[in-house]
């Protein structure tokens, strides 16, 4: 059973998948930072200071012992107030679109690379080259 597991792990697809998952997780953090720290603040700047991440609709009552800000999504959420955080959803949707676009670009580049590899004609084997040279010499002589 251990040998079967070792053979399974050593297959290229499993190792490739593991590497892809690790790189994907790291890439997700990069895209989240890009969205949260660059894109959304720029959108906020051009829309007059609009901060999407703090937009929400409160669905329930605020507890009597609540000490946070009634305009803070994080404070209300931590207090257990039911909320619809549509601003946070917009941020996550932008993250998804960025990741999907980059994955599309990578897949497209790989497909183009594979087409270029397929388009190259295969070089003839050495024996075929030798036979062609012999045939050419024989045609010259006779």
UniProtKB/Swiss-Prot annotation:
Database matches in Pfam families: MscL (PF01741)
Keyword Isomerase among record annotations: no
Subcellular location: Cell inner membrane
Membrane disposition: Multi-pass membrane protein
GO cellular component terms, semicolon-separated: plasma membrane
GO molecular function: mechanosensitive monoatomic ion channel activity
Segments crossing the lipid bilayer: 14-34, 86-106
InterPro entries, A to Z: Mechanosensitive_channel_CS, MS_channel, MSC/AndL, MscL_channel
Keywords: Cell inner membrane, Cell membrane, Ion channel, Ion transport, Membrane, Transmembrane, Transmembrane helix, Transport
Main location: membrane
Record has Calcium as a keyword: no
Assembly with partners or alone: Homopentamer.
Function: Channel that opens in response to stretch forces in the membrane lipid bilayer. May participate in the regulation of osmotic pressure changes within the cell.
HAMAP family in alphabetical order: MscL (MF_00115)
Similarity comment: Belongs to the MscL family.
Protein name, entry field: Large-conductance mechanosensitive channel
Natural source organism: Rhizorhabdus wittichii (strain DSM 6014 / CCUG 31198 / JCM 15750 / NBRC 105917 / EY 4224 / RW1) (Sphingomonas wittichii)
Gene: mscL
């Amino acid at each position: 059973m251990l040998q079967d597991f070792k053979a399974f792990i050593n297959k290229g697809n499993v190792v490739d998948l593991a590497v892809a998952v690790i790189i994907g997780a790291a890439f997700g953090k990069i895209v989240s930072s890009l969205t949260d720290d660059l894109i959304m603040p720029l959108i906020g700047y051009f829309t007059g200071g609009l901060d999407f991440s703090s937009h929400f609709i409160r669905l329930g009552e605020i507890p009597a012992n609540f000490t946070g800000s009634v305009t803070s999504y994080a404070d209300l959420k931590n207090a257990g107030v039911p909320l619809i955080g549509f601003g946070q959803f917009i941020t996550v949707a932008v993250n998804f679109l960025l990741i999907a676009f980059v994955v599309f670009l990578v897949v497209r580049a790989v497909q183009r690379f594979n087409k270029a590899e397929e388009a190259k004609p295969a070089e003839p084997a050495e024996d075929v080259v030798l036979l062609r040279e012999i045939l050419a010499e024989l045609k010259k002589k006779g």
